[in-house]
């Protein structure tokens, strides 16, 4: 992101995909409790979790979960989350530069905003379709409660895949693809384009060098913009994916039920943990991604020089 100078090593597509996958997995492991808190806040009010448990704020939700269901609950669904990043983030982030270059091929000028958005749309759309089953399982495991004699729907990650496919249908593993596609198209375009533009502005105007402080600031700004614009689609996606069979006939029905029963603010439930999670996830992921790309490219150049 931001074209390297002629003196810099151009990372290959394989290096970008691998770096994105590893960086995203690391970011997920560190920020996963925030994601679990976000999911619980987003589904609060629809009646599946006992009304005696109320989650208030980020720290309140994390503390309540730890006290009532145990610390491991904060990481329930992590294996599916890691699988999601391997199949999803590695593609949407790792392929972004390559697809952007394809749309800009034959032009001497830097990629236009249209090129960047087109690349974000394409990589985000493909990644969502491939990674959707992991998203469904992750959300289901994060949402299920063990309180007050409620029997868990799933005992683990692979049990969840099997139960969903056999008791609901194989296609249920792609449940919520539409709102998730909308959410991730927004995220991919806003996150990657904002990060790219912010980083380019800082580097090209010589405000910051293309190094860790620049990556930190760019990632933080991208995280805020992305969270604000993607929140409504994110809440609807979580509600629809976690819903029982027949609870919502369609995605629009889910959105309308939320609007009529809980009001427009329901679309921003879990905004604070969502922002904290996405901003911190972005910072960790982009910093690790940039450093991994550099180091792997240098290693590759060293190997090439010695052979």
Swiss-Prot record:
GO terms of molecular function: cardiolipin binding; long-chain fatty acid binding; oxidative phosphorylation uncoupler activity; purine ribonucleotide binding
Ranges occupied by Solcar repeats: 11-102, 111-201, 210-295
GO biological process: one example: cellular response to reactive oxygen species
Keywords per UniProt: Ion channel, Ion transport, Membrane, Mitochondrion, Mitochondrion inner membrane, Oxidation, Repeat, Transmembrane, Transmembrane helix, Transport
InterPro entries: Mit_carrier, Mito_Metabolite_Transporter, Mitochondrial_sb/sol_carrier, Mt_carrier_dom_sf
Domain of life: Eukaryota
Reactions accelerated catalytically: H(+)(in) = H(+)(out)
Compartments, as annotated in UniProt: Mitochondrion inner membrane
Positions of fatty acid 16:0 binding: 56, 269
Keyword Repeat among UniProt keywords: yes
Alphabetized SUPFAM superfamilies for the sequence: Mitochondrial carrier (SSF103506)
Record function comment: Mitochondrial protein responsible for thermogenic respiration, a specialized capacity of brown adipose tissue and beige fat that participates in non-shivering adaptive thermogenesis to temperature and diet variations and more generally to the regulation of energy balance. Functions as a long-chain fatty acid/LCFA and proton symporter, simultaneously transporting one LCFA and one proton through the inner mitochondrial membrane. However, LCFAs remaining associated with the transporter via their hydrophobic tails, it results in an apparent transport of protons activated by LCFAs.
Identification of the protein by name: Mitochondrial brown fat uncoupling protein 1
